Structures are given as structure tokens and as C-alpha cells.
Amino acid sequence: MDYFGPHIFGYLIALLHFLGLIAAIHAVLTVRTAQGAIAWALSLLFMPYLTLIPYLVFGRSTFDAYIQARRQANVEMHKAINELNWRPWVEEALTARASKAYASLRAMPKLGRMPCLANNQVRLLVNGDATFEAIFNAIRRSHKAVLIQFFIIHDDDLGRRLQRLLLEKAAEGVSIHLLYDRIGSHSLPASYVQTLRDAGVQVHAFATRSGWLNRFQVNFRNHRKIVVVDGMLGFVGGHNVGDEYLGKKPPLAPWRDTHVQVSGPVVACLQESFAEDWFWAARELPPLILPDTYPDDGVLCQLLASGPADAYETCSLFFVEAIHAATERVWITSPYFIPDEAVFAALRLAVLRDVDVRILLPARPDHRIVYAASSLYAFEAVRAGVRVFRYQPGFLHQKVVLIDNEISAIGSANLDNRSFRLNFEVMLLTVDDDFATEVEHMLEADFAKAREIAKEESRQTHRLQQLGMRVARLISPIL
């Protein structure tokens, strides 16, 4: 023991470096981006005592167990679908393909796993009051089934309003299925969930529970926000369930966010997306409901669900294709701006094509490191000719894309690596001049309350701030 004692720290350091080597090899083999693989490999090789635990938490970017679960869910869903009247849905897909507007989507229908469908009705919901009033009213009118999925649910005033409403509808015999993300809703008390379960509400948490190492994972979060009522009415967007989304929690108040209400055949795609996630959490299917007929007119919509289990990097490619499709303008709003090389190159090329490229970001940070990295990318974008704005009144959380005068997308995906490759996201694409005009007017009102970043601002930034932003960018592949 006298010999062993003085050398124990040497043995521990050697062991850590050995484990760091193993982890570095794993990073090279599994991390999706070259930047991320290099960043992890170098840090694990040279500083394993600082990076091994963060790698367990943030590092892995594959989720094989989910792929298998999704395939199994798809088989089960096809069995259920065969028992439904699915013909109107097929007809709507054929109608969409025959329309002139379909061509404007370019590669989107092939990129997403869902078809583009005609004859939908959409309604823009600006901010939390309008969003939750519409959602709660729809749930109150439900008769058959309600599917609810949020990244965050808080046990606060808004969360308890939702709980009371679900208890009321469950008592009436409505089938309620509630899915929340275990990490996003980490503060949700067990008593909140148990009260719902005792009343007959089906509640499950989405969690990466496959394997011992996944117990440490915070990647692969389910960031989707979906509500479907009786298979007829759907909601998707950026809001979660919490008082802050109603603008009731300074210093980020007032909270700026956007949702969209949709009815028509694309609601079937919302149900399918929910069913895949529900099957992963519960190993069973929720009720899938389709109406016998749909309206004879409406707008083209496509649901784009993305996640780390996809064969392609669907979310990143969506932004690339959207930017490349623009001939007149591309306006994007996001709380975070950490683009990968492909997205940033697409933005620069759009500027060279004389496209009006604008990005709207929050002026107030909710995550300091992410804000620092976003600021550096914002300065670089401004130097490339992109117009970047900071929304002043409060925190901007909406995720909206407007392409030219026809295509808009609203959903949960941020303009960052976590949405591109690590989270499960959903966006609703709408092809319609009138709805695009509504989105345009909404964004123009937001730009009117924003301050445009000038080119000289990056040079006026203090050197310590510049250093902090560059350090933040080094770890941006894992933010």
C-alpha cells in the first residue's frame, strides 16, 4: 500500500485518458457532423477529466432503439389504418400533386415522411392567450379523443388549467392521451401526473431509456408541440404549457410566440406523428380518427416531422431547401441562431441572388452560452449581407419561416444544431398566398419592434465579449 498510495492519482489519470481514448473513437464513429466529431475527439483525448461526463450527457447522436421502435410502430399503425376509411386522404394527396402550387415545394414532399395534402383550413394564432384559448376551447368541445404532446408542462396556473380541463373531459368519457418530455418537464411533480392517471387520463413521458448510458442523456429530446382533437382539429407551433408562455414571468416577459390551428386531411399526419412518439413511450397505439369526408376547397399543407432517427438530416435539409427555394425573400424567426455550414452557405447564396434575407432573433437571452454563440453567427451573417434583427419588447420564441409570397412554415424547430440533429421536431408547411400574407403582416409587426444589427457592431464589441462568443461557438455543435 505504501507503493500504491503515492501513485494512485497517476493510475486514475491514466485510466481517464484510456477511457477518453475509447470515447474519442466512439465520437468519431457516431457524431454526425465533422465539427462535432473533431471537437469531442480532441477534448476527450486531451482533457478527459473535464469532458467524459459531458460526453455521456451531450455526446451521442444516434438513437438506434428509437429507429426500431418507430418501425414497429409503423407496422402497427398500418394495421390500424387498414381498418379506417383512408380513401379521402389518398384523394387529397393526388389533388395536391395535380395543383400548380405543389411544384413550389420542390423537394419537400420527398424530404418529409408525410405527403402534401390539399383542402386544409389554417388559422394563425399569435402569442399565448390566443393559442391556449383556441386549444382549450377545442378540448372543451371534444367528444371522442384528445391527443396532447408538449416538450414542457409546468405545474403552474396554466398547467393546472390544462389539468382541470383534462380531468373534466376524462370524466365525460373522452379518451385523453398526454405525452411530455421527461427532460423538458423535469420539474413536473409526480402528483400532477398521478392525479391525471387516477382519473383515467393516459399519461406517458418520452425518455431515452434504452441502455444504461442513456440514463445520462439529455440529447434526443422530444421538442414537438402537438394537439389533436377528435381527429378533426390540430394545433402545432412553439408554445409549451407554462405561465411564461403567457408572458407572466419577467424578465423575459412579454413572451412572443406563434402557433397554428389546422383542420383537414393534414390532421391525419399530426396523428401519425403523435402515434409514433406515443408508441415509443407506451408500446401501444393511441386512437386514430379520420372523418369520412373532407371539404372540397382549402390550402395545401405538409407536415414535416424530423428527428435523429431519420435517414436524412431532415430538419437541416428543410432549412437549406427553403432558403434555396426563395426567389424574392426568406424571413426566418428563431430564438437561437447556430446554423451549420450548409444552412449558412444557403443564406449567403440567397443574398447573392438578391433575395431579401432577414433573420429575427431575441434581444434578451434565456441561455447565456447559446446567446453568445448566436451573436457571433449573427455578426457573420450581417457581414455576408443578411439583415439580422433583435426583437426588443421581450423574449422571442417563435419558429416561423416565410418564403416569397406563398410558402410559410410554423412549428417547433429552431435554427440550431440541436433542432437539426438532436431533437424531434415538427413544422407545418402551408402553400397559400392569403395565409402567407397573414404571416407577412405578423412578421412586419415584429420587425417594427426590432432593432437591426449594424455591420460595425461586431467591431465595437469588447474583446472579452468576442472571446466569449468564439469560445461559445467552439462548443456550438453540442449546444
Swiss-Prot record:
Cite the active-site annotation: 223, 225, 230, 397, 399, 404
Task: Enumerate the catalysed reactions.
Answer: 2 a 1,2-diacyl-sn-glycero-3-phospho-(1'-sn-glycerol) = a cardiolipin + glycerol
Q: What topology in the membrane does the UniProt record assign? A: Multi-pass membrane protein
Keyword Magnesium attached: no
Q: Which GO terms describe its molecular function?
A: cardiolipin synthase activity
Q: Where does the PLD phosphodiesterase domain start and stop, copy by copy?
A: 218-245, 392-419
Subcellular localization is given as: Cell inner membrane
Top-rank taxon of the source lineage equals Bacteria
Q: Which Pfam families would you find in this protein's record?
A: PLDc_2 (PF13091), PLDc_N (PF13396)
Q: Give the CC-aspect GO terms.
A: plasma membrane
Which EC class, in a word?
Answer: transferase
Question: What is a biological process (GO) this protein takes part in?
Answer: cardiolipin biosynthetic process
User: Which SMART domains does this one have?
Assistant: PLDc
What keywords are annotated for this sequence in UniProt? Answer: Cell inner membrane, Cell membrane, Lipid biosynthesis, Lipid metabolism, Membrane, Phospholipid biosynthesis, Phospholipid metabolism, Repeat, Transferase, Transmembrane, Transmembrane helix
User: EC number(s)?
Assistant: 2.7.8.-
Q: What residue ranges are annotated as transmembrane?
A: 8-28, 38-58
What does this protein do, in the record's words? Catalyzes the reversible phosphatidyl group transfer from one phosphatidylglycerol molecule to another to form cardiolipin (CL) (diphosphatidylglycerol) and glycerol.
Family in the record: Belongs to the phospholipase D family. Cardiolipin synthase subfamily. ClsA sub-subfamily.
Name of protein: Cardiolipin synthase A
Record the organism.
Pseudomonas fluorescens (strain ATCC BAA-477 / NRRL B-23932 / Pf-5)
Q: What is the lineage of its organism?
A: Bacteria, Pseudomonadati, Pseudomonadota, Gammaproteobacteria, Pseudomonadales
